[in-house]
Amino acid sequence: GLFSFNTPNFILRFALGKTDYQLGVEDYRRFAAEYEYFGRSVWQQTLNLTAEEQRQLITLLEKNYRPENRIYRYNFFYDNCATRPRDKVEESLQKSGSQLLFSNAHTENGETKSYRDIVHQYTKGHPWAQFGIDFCIGSQADHPINDRQMMFAPFYLMDAFAGARIANTSDNKALVASTKKIIDCEPDVSDSAENDIWNM
């Protein structure tokens, strides 16, 4: 995804959910080289989709990349680079006659988090970024959120995908067939949460 950092008041608009975001396509080798250069680990989850489910997902992604669809109003919590892929996977499965079922592992285990808690996890070691985002997101970010809302953060989405299942009238299977780390850089944000919020 692409932002124009030349947009007036970009950081404030970003935090307030008033920034336009553009879907971009990049060669995998360039993507991998950039992440490795900046010391960011990359995880890959292979989805356990049938040929028809794959076709539906590709069709939706191609539709989303059309010029009239590729720009949308980014929202830091509700419509971002983690929630959009989740929604497209759900939509593609529905079109194939299946349903994506997520567990509620965090809330069922009694874990209580707010949006701000997760933002602080990802901005650890970056006090000015943390202060700026805290200033902009307001008190609504302090309310407890459910597992689905936690998926605005990529590692929470990855965990949710790992525990999700695809269900239909004839089958019930895991969404993720395999997970592996394809670029291994230290420290790993999944362990130390040291990457800043912009890398979400």
Report each predicted region and the residues it spans.
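Glycine-rich catalytic cores of cysteine/serine-nucleophile enzymes that process amide/ester linkages
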Residues: G1-R40
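Acidic/histidine-rich, surface-exposed loop or edge segments in extracytoplasmic proteins
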Residues: E34-W43, K63-N69
